[in-house]
Amino acid sequence: MNTVRSEKDSMGAIDVPADKLWGAQTQRSLEHFRISTEKMPTSLIHALALTKRAAAKVNEDLGLLSEEKASAIRQAADEVLAGQHDDEFPLAIWQTGSGTQSNMNMNEVLANRASELLGGVRGMERKVHPNDDVNKSQSSNDVFPTAMHVAALLALRKQLIPQLKTLTQTLSEKSRAFADIVKIGRTHLQDATPLTLGQEISGWVAMLEHNLKHIEYSLPHVAELALGGTAVGTGLNTHPEYARRVADELAVITCAPFVTAPNKFEALATCDALVQAHGALKGLAASLMKIANDVRWLASGPRCGIGEISIPENEPGSSIMPGKVNPTQCEALTMLCCQVMGNDVAINMGGASGNFELNVFRPMVIHNFLQSVRLLADGMESFNKHCAVGIEPNRERINQLLNESLMLVTALNTHIGYDKAAEIAKKAHKEGLTLKAAALALGYLSEAEFDRWVRPEQMVGSMKAGG
């Protein structure tokens, strides 16, 4: 039994594994780009299949493709979407910057499979042509950016945004639950005036709410599709109604608000929509890193750290120190946030480096974009499930640190003035006294006045957690 078959393209014949659906151009890419291990993301492959499915339907409706061929292409695309042919898409991210080889990989797989569905023999009877039929009314230059936007929008809507909302809700519930717990604040890593634990956490909630708004603001641009621009944005070799119809078809089959890009030249020449959207993801990463750092500092200890909150003990933390438990969810979250920030640099460089009518950094851009979405979505889910939901206050420790703080002296500013209040704090710190003892020793106020004016619960202001 032959292990290879001969396939040909405009450059001639080449041997292809007999059991594979791909053709000559895919095989050439496999042989010429043996670079690292990163493959085209499955979600991008499925977005390409969605794009080809929609194009086949519209080409049929416009009388440009026979019902027989269009139906076979759609059936083959549905098989790809069902995951039946995932191993037919082996190409590396590091290939042509337009994604042409992955577009042809999809064209060849769908053409060969559609030909089989119509009774043809793989690689011998080409009843459906990869370029003339599967790629009809298309160019890699508009297909690949379209698939990028489809994959990106679906990932943001289905993966990232739900997890962001869940984590925000968890922290909002914690903020309300801890609204009455007065604790010492900290600025510059030094003691500051009091606030409630609920107020502190409400800041985290507001950060995430703003992140959600920033991400949602970026979605309409990502929903604009390049399909119909063909080679350079002019729409050469397309029907006048094709671009609008194919965007409408993709919107229907994905239940997402896709529209045809109003300017195809921008859609082909730039990655601006994904640059902007990933900027919002970088902002989310910055917020999550701050939150995770706050959590692990507040939970530090258990006896020699801040220790104002407890977090779940999920696994042993040391191979040498018995009983040690570490804030591992915080560490995982901060690491992936660093990766997202690195991805942002790569995406910015790729987005800035397009020339004339086409950006040729697209595979790298979408690889990093989808990785960031996956990291943030998975990271938030894990952090929420294994850490955030289990945050609990250590009231005794909170009260101890609150009562030991010298910054409670700030409450005296309006009664005896800043200079005298500062003198009290310095004396207490230098001589190891309580604030009250230092104040009475200096004779600036009576014990009754001190007790009446220095009350932490009255120093947290009227700003409620959440607004």
From Swiss-Prot:
State the active site. Answer: H188, S318
Tell me where on the tree of life, at the top rank, the source sits: Bacteria
Q: Which cysteines are joined by disulfide bonds?
A: none
One biological-process term from Gene Ontology? malate metabolic process
User: Pfam families, from UniProt?
Assistant: FumaraseC_C, Lyase_1
Record-linked SUPFAM superfamilies: L-aspartase-like
UniProtKB keywords: Cytoplasm, Lyase, Tricarboxylic acid cycle
Q: What does this protein do?
A: Involved in the TCA cycle. Catalyzes the stereospecific interconversion of fumarate to L-malate.
This chain belongs to the protein called Fumarate hydratase class II
Organism of origin: Escherichia coli O6:H1 (strain CFT073 / ATCC 700928 / UPEC)
